[in-house]
């Protein structure tokens, strides 16, 4: 194994979406530091934080059927039944929803909670309220995906927040995705909601910590054997 390969295995990858931001912070650091060294140190800290924010670590994703995996890093902020956003076309009856709130310190790369085919992508402009508020689901800017599976349709909604002002979607309508695949990113603090079909049973509670691509949020059948994994 070469030295470069060894370093790559030890260093957490940076998502390409962050390159322009990291480069901008780096240039600003050099310019400010040339005028006043304390500003250079501040800029260096900001550059390091930006690189940390856009980190994209490899995750060990359970592959067993019947499991719903967290789409985001963060804290479970809601578990309950809520009407899905109308633009998703999932009906007007309340569906079970699990919300994951991401702070500015969490990894913000979002992943598919289940494997399936993306049958709809719906973007809706809106406000930039605190993403931890209940009304953020209705009022904030958001981007929703509907994933069709053999067990039913799942809704995944990326919600912008007070600081987050840019939702990035990596996938296209009609595309087939695997569980744990990268589906998008939200810059600088936000929330992801997962709407589950009626057969799902939540396995997490409010306040629980979630890891994108790894934490099991719910199961579609009892007693799923969690033995198979993939690195993603």
From Swiss-Prot:
Post-translational modification: Is synthesized initially as an inactive proenzyme. Formation of the active enzyme involves a self-maturation process in which the active site pyruvoyl group is generated from an internal serine residue via an autocatalytic post-translational modification. Two non-identical subunits are generated from the proenzyme in this reaction, and the pyruvate is formed at the N-terminus of the alpha chain, which is derived from the carboxyl end of the proenzyme.
Compartments where located: Cell membrane
Pfam families named in the record: PS_Dcarbxylase
GO molecular function, one term: phosphatidylserine decarboxylase activity
Segments forming a coiled coil: none
Keywords assigned: Cell membrane, Decarboxylase, Lipid biosynthesis, Lipid metabolism, Lyase, Membrane, Phospholipid biosynthesis, Phospholipid metabolism, Pyruvate, Zymogen
Active site, renumbered: 190 (schiff-base intermediate with substrate)
Cofactor note: Binds 1 pyruvoyl group covalently per subunit.
Site location (Cleavage (non-hydrolytic)): 189-190
Required cofactor names: pyruvate
NCBIfam families the record matches: PRK05305.1-1, PRK05305.1-2, PRK05305.1-3, PRK05305.2-5
Protein's name according to its UniProt entry: Phosphatidylserine decarboxylase proenzyme
SUBUNIT field: Heterodimer of a large membrane-associated beta subunit and a small pyruvoyl-containing alpha subunit.
Membrane topology: Peripheral membrane protein
GO cellular component assignments: plasma membrane
GO biological processes: phosphatidylethanolamine biosynthetic process
Modified positions (Pyruvic acid (Ser)) in chain numbering: 190
Function: Catalyzes the formation of phosphatidylethanolamine (PtdEtn) from phosphatidylserine (PtdSer).
Catalytic activity: a 1,2-diacyl-sn-glycero-3-phospho-L-serine + H(+) = a 1,2-diacyl-sn-glycero-3-phosphoethanolamine + CO2
EC number(s) reported in the record: 4.1.1.65
Organism, as annotated: Methylocella silvestris (strain DSM 15510 / CIP 108128 / LMG 27833 / NCIMB 13906 / BL2)
Pathway terms, separated by semicolons: Phospholipid metabolism; phosphatidylethanolamine biosynthesis; phosphatidylethanolamine from CDP-diacylglycerol: step 2/2
HAMAP family found in the cross-reference section: PS_decarb_PSD_A
Similarity annotation: Belongs to the phosphatidylserine decarboxylase family. PSD-A subfamily.
């Amino acid at each position: 194994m070469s030295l470069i390969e060894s370093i790559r295995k030890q260093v957490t990858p940076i998502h390409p979406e962050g390159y322009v931001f990291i480069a901008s912070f780096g240039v600003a650091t050099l310019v400010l530091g040339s005028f006043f060294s304390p500003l250079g140190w501040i800029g260096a800290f900001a550059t390091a934080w930006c690189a940390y924010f856009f980190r994209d670590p490899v995750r060990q994703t359970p592959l067993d059927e019947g499991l719903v995996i967290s789409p985001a890093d963060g804290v479970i902020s809601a578990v309950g039944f809520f009407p899905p956003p109308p633009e998703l076309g999932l009906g007007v009856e309340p569906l079970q929803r699990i919300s994951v709130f991401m702070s500015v310190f969490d990894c913000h790369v979002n992943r598919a909670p289940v494997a399936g085919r993306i049958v709809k992508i719906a973007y809706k402009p809106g406000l930039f309220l605190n993403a931890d508020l209940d009304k953020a689901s209705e009022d904030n800017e958001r981007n929703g995906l509907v994933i069709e599976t053999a067990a039913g349709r799942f809704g995944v909604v990326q919600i912008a927040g007070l600081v987050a002002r840019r939702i990035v979607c990596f996938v296209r309508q009609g595309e087939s995705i695997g569980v744990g695949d990268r589906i998008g990113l939200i810059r600088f603090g936000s929330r992801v909601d997962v709407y589950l079909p009626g057969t799902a049973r939540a396995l997490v509670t409010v306040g629980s910590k979630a890891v994108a691509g790894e934490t099991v949020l719910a199961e579609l059948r009892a007693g799923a054997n969690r033995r198979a994994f993939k690195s993603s």
